[in-house]
């Protein structure tokens, strides 16, 4: 296996009941959950599948309400997925199951007790997940969703490195119990107190190293990982901890071990902004923590310039003297002020923030890349509103759709954004359109959808029984959408459009997204009625709409029989 493959799983809302609790160490609370909804069950006329959790690091999402009744924040269950509702009271936390026994109707979750010994295990200092677990009693209910997917791990490995802090222990325990790959393991675990040390079921060729590290210690875990003597052959590196503590481990995996991206899975389970806030973080993955460095437009442009000019790479490798960067001095001064760089005895070094910008593409894309270019188009929004053209077109001379054809980076970004459609495949693959013999595919998400239904993508040519468009409209202006749909009439009598038609409750600030969308294509994000209006303008009739989850709708169009 040369790459990691994501296996989508049906998203199902489940109500479980606490069967027992146990403090397995002073800093780890175990909760055993049961109930008929761990197996196949029925709700509201829907037959819903049993819980599956095939990967040792898969996670389920726990649902809480910060105020009021949890029933008011629960997502809506649809046939093959869920629809999150927007709610200020909605709180979710992700946890890795230690064990799942569907036949025995038992799910086991472990919760790190960050506040152990403080007397605040169930108080305001505890995160919402920790507080719930410490207060849980048999009979209490818990609502969960997921896993949304599982990542197949590579099998062409000779040894595995597992590293993390206390939040990684559930995944490590499950790996050792199930052994998805039968190879020697080197395990490095950081704990905040000796009381968190545990006995794991190690194999004869496994080795484990325990290190003491405070919550704000970003060096001890990485140093212990760097001390691991590499074994012969190809490694697989898995790590989970506080996001910034993982930065040197990312470098170690790629530079020292030579681990390919397909053989590296390093996830920030939480982000520490202040030592006292650790308890509130719980154990949820946060691959792209928000960086509090943009205090003005000037700092945004400074960070963008540092990324685009390669200055951060120069500092990371050479640690140049500050006085040697005469021409760059104003830029360096701003980067020092916003905590991207630090001056150590006259030499420049990256801070944790600078490291994050350099090694985490999800963080960097806020300042450089297509997403940042879309934000930059807002500079021309006022002029664009006067002309009736999108701000992107005013700024670049091309529409966004034209840019996607002309520039590989824009096209690749759209394909990357559509990659998330893989999580909706359990619903998408049930659409009646896929019973047709000859199907064409188009749009940035065409590859994901076609692969999910066992088809291939080819340039549209000739006629088809049906054409499926995956995110084919989102990057187009209204005028371009109508023209595209009119052209589609020459290829088929039936089209299915898979598009986002409402905000996803967990998808970030919808108001900011709507403004950037306006600047990019000249209109607000389209809802179902707007899609229908544009289809009608192109002489199509909407015959069916199906929610496939996450604010996404599959809209079936037929050629208007009144139009030749």
Where are these regions (language model features)?
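Short acidic low-complexity segments
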Residues: 151, 455-464
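Conserved Class I S-adenosyl-L-methionine-dependent methyltransferase catalytic core
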Residues: 334-436
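Conserved class I S-adenosyl-L-methionine
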Residues: 434-448
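A conserved beta-strand element that flanks and buttresses the S-adenosyl-L-methionine
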Residues: 468-469
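A short, conserved alpha-helix within the catalytic core of class I
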Residues: 475-491
């Amino acid at each position: 296996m040369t790459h990691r493959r994501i296996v989508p799983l049906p998203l199902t809302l489940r109500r479980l009941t606490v069967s027992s609790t146990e403090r397995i160490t002073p800093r780890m609370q175990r909760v055993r959950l049961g109930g008929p909804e761990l197996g196949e069950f029925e709700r509201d006329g829907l037959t819903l599948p049993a819980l599956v959790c095939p990967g040792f690091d898969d996670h389920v999402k726990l649902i809480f309400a910060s105020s009021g009744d949890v029933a008011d924040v629960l997502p809506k269950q649809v046939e093959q997925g869920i629809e999150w509702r927007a709610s200020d009271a909605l709180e979710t936390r992700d946890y890795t199951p230690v064990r799942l026994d569907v036949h025995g109707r038992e799910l086991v979750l472990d919760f790190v007790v960050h506040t152990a010994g403080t007397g605040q295990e169930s108080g305001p200092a505890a995160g919402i997940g920790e507080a719930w677990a410490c207060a849980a009693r048999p009979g209490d209910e818990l609502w969960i969703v997921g896993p949304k997917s599982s990542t197949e791990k590579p099998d062409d490995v000779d040894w595995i490195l597992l590293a993390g802090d206390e939040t990684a222990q559930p995944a490590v325990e499950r790996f050792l119990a199930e052994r998805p790959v039968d190879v020697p393991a080197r395990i490095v675990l950081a704990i905040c107190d000796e009381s968190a040390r545990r006995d794991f079921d190690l194999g004869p060729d496994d080795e484990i190293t325990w290190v003491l590290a405070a919550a704000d210690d970003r060096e001890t875990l990485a140093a212990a990982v760097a001390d691991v003597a590499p074994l012969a052959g190809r490694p697989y590196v898995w790590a989970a901890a506080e996001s910034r503590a993982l930065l040197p481990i990312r470098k170690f995996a790629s530079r020292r071990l030579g681990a390919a991206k397909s053989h590296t899975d390093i996830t920030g389970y939480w982000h520490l902004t202040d030592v006292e806030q650790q308890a509130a973080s719980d154990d949820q993955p946060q691959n792209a923590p928000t960086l509090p460095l943009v205090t003005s437009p000037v700092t945004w442009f400074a960070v963008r310039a540092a990324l685009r000019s390669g200055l951060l790479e120069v500092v990371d490798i050479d640690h140049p003297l500050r006085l040697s960067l005469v021409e760059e001095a104003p830029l360096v001064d701003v980067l020092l002020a916003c905590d991207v760089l630090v001056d150590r005895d006259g030499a420049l070094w990256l801070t944790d923030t600078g490291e994050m910008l350099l090694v985490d593409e999800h963080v960097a894309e806020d300042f450089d890349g297509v997403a940042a270019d879309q934000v930059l188009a807002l500079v021309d929004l006022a002029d664009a509103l006067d002309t009736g053209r999108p701000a992107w077109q005013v700024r670049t001379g091309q529409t966004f759709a034209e840019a996607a054809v002309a520039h590989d980076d824009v096209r690749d970004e759209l394909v990357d954004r559509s990659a998330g459609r893989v999580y909706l495949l359990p619903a998408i693959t049930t659409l009646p359109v896929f019973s047709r013999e000859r199907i064409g595919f188009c749009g940035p998400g065409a590859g994901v959808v076609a692969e999910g239904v066992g088809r291939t993508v080819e340039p549209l040519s000739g006629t088809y029984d049906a054409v499926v468009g995956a995110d084919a409209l989102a990057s187009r202006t209204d005028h371009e959408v109508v023209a595209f749909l009119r052209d589609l009439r020459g290829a088929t009598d039936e089209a299915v459009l898979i598009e986002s038609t409402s905000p996803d409750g967990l998808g970030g600030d919808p108001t900011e997204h709507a403004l950037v969308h306006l600047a990019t294509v000249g209109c607000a994000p389209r809802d179902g009625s707007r899609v229908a209006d544009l289809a009608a303008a192109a002489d199509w009739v909407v015959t069916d709409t199906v929610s496939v989850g996450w604010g996404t709708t599959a809209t079936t169009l037929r050629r208007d029989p009144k139009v030749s």
